């Protein structure tokens, strides 16, 4: 996708997926505006990775929005009294790492930011193949939110809508790693683990998904 002369707000968590989307946008010559959230997550270390990726790609602007979802919890990512699941990804089950309404909130804020700066796109690292079963990472969710974006702001009503850009939506993690290699994404600077420790736990769903892909690419874990 040619994004030259386009501007994009990228939801940049510091993880593998959002960092790869940032690399794709950079290679496509878009003006990139990064947006991260300090939402009371136990793995706040991801924000350091997000800042590192923003600097690596020399993006136009990078903002961290403080939005404390730990005030009401509801997820093991925002409530440390809840244990992280370590039994591996369970098919047809939404794990307790799901944060209620998180993507809806984040994309809504990104939509406001994008309209304020007259951006053309919102870049999201969601993918429907290698994910933990979250309801807000699926194609039907993205489709419906795009419909909402048409209706919910001035740009949409003037038939110049801000579009949700999801280049990874149909890719598995091995494919995403290939894109990361191809687009100068420093994998060792990204962060996926949910545990909140200084080093990846290797047991949470996010670590397991990443490790499986790493093994297929024969990447050593010390290159995490």
Swiss-Prot record:
| Protein's UniProt keywords contain Transmembrane helix | no
Family, similarity comment: Belongs to the QueC family.
Catalytic reactions on record: 7-carboxy-7-deazaguanine + NH4(+) + ATP = 7-cyano-7-deazaguanine + ADP + phosphate + H2O + H(+)
The UniProt keywords, alphabetically, are: ATP-binding, Ligase, Metal-binding, Nucleotide-binding, Queuosine biosynthesis, Zinc
Any idea which positions bind Zn(2+)? 193, 201, 204, 207
The alphabetized list of GO BP terms reads: queuosine biosynthetic process
Q: Which gene encodes it?
A: queC
Q: Give the cofactors, semicolon-separated.
A: Zn(2+)
Q: Which residues bind ATP?
A: 12-22
Give GO terms: molecular function aspect only. ATP binding; ligase activity, forming carbon-nitrogen bonds; zinc ion binding
Q: Which note does the record give on the cofactor?
A: Binds 1 zinc ion per subunit.
- Function in brief: Catalyzes the ATP-dependent conversion of 7-carboxy-7-deazaguanine (CDG) to 7-cyano-7-deazaguanine (preQ(0)).
Write down the superkingdom of origin: Bacteria
Looking at the keywords, is Membrane present?
Answer: no
Q: What class of enzyme is it?
A: ligase
This protein's pathway? Purine metabolism; 7-cyano-7-deazaguanine biosynthesis
- Annotated protein name in UniProt: 7-cyano-7-deazaguanine synthase
Q: Which Pfam families match?
A: QueC
**Originating species:** Prochlorococcus marinus (strain MIT 9515)
Enzyme Commission numbers on file: 6.3.4.20
